[in-house]
């Protein structure tokens, strides 16, 4: 077990959920808990959100769905965003998982298993309105409109789409996608709809439809949401170095003065990117401390020379992620996004869930 502690504030996640629910008003709000709840624990987060009446949980794969179903029981809907494949269709049926069907081939597979089981099988349809990732194409949607037998045997519960640039509120592409989505929905007047991801919720009620599907905003990856994550690491080694001493692999940092250098027990094997070498920072008692030298697999060095002497001791905790250094802020240093910071968090951390 790592000496580092990853604290996940469940109350903050629940408060974020309730804030989003308040914005959505009459629309339902689900939760994207794929990639193990963005690295924070899908089961723990889902159980907490169930207490706030969340009933829709979105995962990426059937494996994620099965694990969640085993933990949560049958009282919630679990949606598999990557859809259904020949090899996992029976597993989806056994564990009451609902696939989001992304193309005619997946519809065909699900229809085949509906015939085998002699019953309707639940599904969502994903219409591609412009993100051009997953989703039925315009030609495929037209085929569905003209031949409803293509959906025979399927219990179509929702039609969804996904916004490509919802974090940019004024980007006209959002409205373009909305209008395309609405045009398709006219042909399915009795089917519920879902469009808004986290950013989409903040675009206004026109984007909310029947169900919103936030992920990032639940986990604090939005300026108005509360950060629920704190990652701390203790100082495990201290050394006094003289002027012109080299630090770390390839000697990429050289001291410009007599320095006190501390070592922390985490590295790129724990999801702390090598790109932070010589440019990241941590915080000790609210004071910024620079990272010096290369990030190693299991270790990083920090320059604590400017800290008060009483703050420099073995076991002193440094905050890697927290209110001083949120995932979004950290991500901006190395040109990535907060999603990647969270989902990269390694399995060695001691995870503590607090209310």
Swiss-Prot record:
GO cellular component entries: cytosol
Top-level class of the enzyme under EC nomenclature: isomerase
UniProt EC number: 5.1.1.1
Isomerase listed as a keyword: yes
Keyword hit for Isomerase: yes
Active site positions, chain numbering: 34 (proton acceptor), 249 (proton acceptor)
Record-linked Gene3D superfamilies: Alanine racemase (3.20.20.10), Lyase, Ornithine Decarboxylase, Chain A, domain 1 (2.40.37.10)
Alphabetic keyword roster: Isomerase, Pyridoxal phosphate
N6-(pyridoxal phosphate)lysine modified-residue sites: 34
Pathway terms, separated by semicolons: Amino-acid biosynthesis; D-alanine biosynthesis; D-alanine from L-alanine: step 1/1
Cofactors demanded by this protein: pyridoxal 5'-phosphate
GO molecular function: alanine racemase activity; pyridoxal phosphate binding
GO BP, sorted A to Z: D-alanine biosynthetic process
Catalytic activity: L-alanine = D-alanine
Entry's family note: Belongs to the alanine racemase family.
Protein task: Catalyzes the interconversion of L-alanine and D-alanine. May also act on other amino acids.
Designated name of the protein: Alanine racemase
């Amino acid at each position: 077990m790592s000496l580092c502690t990853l604290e996940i504030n469940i109350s903050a996640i629940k408060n974020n959920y309730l804030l989003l629910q308040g914005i959505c008003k009459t629309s339902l709000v689900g939760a994207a808990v794929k990639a193990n709840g963005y690295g924070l624990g899908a089961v723990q987060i889902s159980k907490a959100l169930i207490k706030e009446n969340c009933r829709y949980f979105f995962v990426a794969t059937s494996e994620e769905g099965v694990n969640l179903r085993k933990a949560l029981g049958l009282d919630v809907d679990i949606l598999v965003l990557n859809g259904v494949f020949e090899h996992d269709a029976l597993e989806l049926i056994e564990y009451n998982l609902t696939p989001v069907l992304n193309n005619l081939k997946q519809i065909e597979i699900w229809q085949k298993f509906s015939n085998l089981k002699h019953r309707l099988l639940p599904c969502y349809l994903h219409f591609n309105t412009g993100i051009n990732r997953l989703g039925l194409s315009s030609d495929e949607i037209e085929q569905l409109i003209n031949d409803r037998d293509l959906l025979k045997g399927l219990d179509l519960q929702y039609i969804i789409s996904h916004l490509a640039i919802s974090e940019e509120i004024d980007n006209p592409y959002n409205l373009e996608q909305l209008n395309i989505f609405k045009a398709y929905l006219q042909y399915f007047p009795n089917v519920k709809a879902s469009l808004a991801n986290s950013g989409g919720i903040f675009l206004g009620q026109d984007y909310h439809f029947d169900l919103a599907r936030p992920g990032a905003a639940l986990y604090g990856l939005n300026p108005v949401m509360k950060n629920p994550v704190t990652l701390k690491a203790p100082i495990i080694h201290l050394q006094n170095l003289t002027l012109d001493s080299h630090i770390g692999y390839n000697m990429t940092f050289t001291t410009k003065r007599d320095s006190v250098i501390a070592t922390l027990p985490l590295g790129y094997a724990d999801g702390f990117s090598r790109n932070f070498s010589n440019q990241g920072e941590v915080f000790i008692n609210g004071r910024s401390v620079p990272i010096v030298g290369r990030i190693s697999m299991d270790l990083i060095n920090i320059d604590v020379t400017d800290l008060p002497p009483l703050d420099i001791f073995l076991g002193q905790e440094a905050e890697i992620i927290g209110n001083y250094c949120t995932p979004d802020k950290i991500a901006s240093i190395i040109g990535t996004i907060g999603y990647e910071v969270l989902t990269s968090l390694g399995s060695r951390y001691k995870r503590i869930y607090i209310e």
